[in-house]
Amino acid sequence: MSKLTIIRGFNDILPQESCKWQFLESKIKSILDKYNYDEVRLPVLEKSELFHRSVGETSDIVSKETYDFVDRSGESLTLRPEGTAGCVRMVIENSLANRGQTQKLWYSGPMFRYERPQKGRYRQFYQLGVEAYGYDNIAIDLEILTISWNLFRELGISECVKLELNSLGSSSNRQEYTKALLEYLKPYHAQLDEDSIKRLDKNPLRILDSKNEQTQQVLANAPKLIDFIDEDSLTRFEQTCEYLDNLGVNYQVNQKLVRGLDYYSGLVFEWVTDRLGAQAAVCAGGRYDNLIESLGGQKAGAIGFAIGLERLLLLLESEGKLPIEDDKSDVFFILDNNQLHRSLLLVENVRQELPALKIDMDLKFGSFKSQFKKADKSDAKIAVIIGQDELLQQAVGVKYLQQDKQQEQIPLNKLINFLEKIAI
């Protein structure tokens, strides 16, 4: 029988890696708590229609990368390729943004895309999403940008990333610009790449996002979106840039930045880095004021961003910003198998009294000699011996594993006070 292996592009997170994830997740939660964002937990499986109507049928994600299947009732379902669509569906279904209500939410979890696996980009990947609903003014734009900047700053990597941003203007601005772009592209139809040709009919703006070199040459003299943006949108964008200047954020206006998802409008942005080889985005977001209404909800402002956590961990690791793994025990208990119940109850009492103490033991309960060998390998500070002789004397033995000190006995009624000093 062949050996079962993990699916290509999926990863197990082993114990020595989990501590890095826990460090990152605790930092994220701490920062978002300061801004009063509430965590939500969303299903990984949604109706396929949700992503067709939000992300866009012509987007690479929906047309090439989703994991779709038909369930036993004949309904088409999709493993979520991103989090915003599901979060908006939840907001609509639970009437969280009706009648002027506001929500500030965040979530974290696995997303799924069928793309070529490479370092920092996998078919199952973890993503942080931060979303705000019901806010129309510029203040929420500035808060979202500040939160994303503070995440990098708190992690010690703000010097490793640069913010790129653009404004897509209003819906009417984009319609006017789309007409001008299509008119410009007419003579160059044959020179466009296959994906861009498909986008001509459904979402021409996405052509600006093409990675094809020949298409980018065609676009070199194309009309600029900034020339079609109304005065209010332009003023708002200029005020955003002025705020970033005052905050001291390293940023650059990128007029070709339109984002890879169809639902964006107004402000769009990416945080990029060159520390992982070719320039790569580690965070991306923007406004999507029409998405709630397009999915059947009441019209409400919306803005958010997402961070790929694997890529962020790679960046932290490359810059030496992850904590050194510390899986050492404080105390290794060595137990007499003949006094098992009493010994285990004693150890459990220590755990209850000193929850910060990291305790280990050999649950195979081999000989004292084999238990001492495991205690030495554990790198614990001390070994506490609970043997028959010790218990008769209402005491435990203490052997110092990291210090050149004589073994000693500690009375049972003083054990907690003694171990409390070990935990400090």
Swiss-Prot record:
Q: Which reaction does it catalyse?
A: tRNA(His) + L-histidine + ATP = L-histidyl-tRNA(His) + AMP + diphosphate + H(+)
The compartments listed are:
Cytoplasm
Identify the EC number(s). 6.1.1.21
Nuclease found in the keyword field: no
**What cellular-component terms does GO give this entry?**
cytoplasm
Main location per the UniProt record: cytoplasm
GO terms for biological process, alphabetical? histidyl-tRNA aminoacylation
Query: What does the UniProt keyword field contain?
Result: Aminoacyl-tRNA synthetase, ATP-binding, Cytoplasm, Ligase, Nucleotide-binding, Protein biosynthesis
User: Is Aminoacyl-tRNA synthetase among the key words of this record?
Assistant: yes
User: Which N-terminal stretch is annotated as signal sequence?
Assistant: none
What is a GO molecular function of this protein?
A: histidine-tRNA ligase activity
Record InterPro entries: aa-tRNA-synth_II, aa-tRNA-synth_II/BPL/LPL, Anticodon-bd, Anticodon-bd_dom_sf, His-tRNA-ligase, HisRS-like_core, HisRS/HisZ
Per its UniProt record, what PANTHER family does this chain match? Answer: HISTIDINE--TRNA LIGASE, MITOCHONDRIAL-RELATED, HISTIDYL-TRNA SYNTHETASE
The UniProt family comment states: Belongs to the class-II aminoacyl-tRNA synthetase family.
Q: What does the annotation say about its assembly with partners?
A: Homodimer.
| Entries under HAMAP family matching the protein | His_tRNA_synth
Official protein name in the record: Histidine--tRNA ligase
Q: What's the name of its gene?
A: hisS
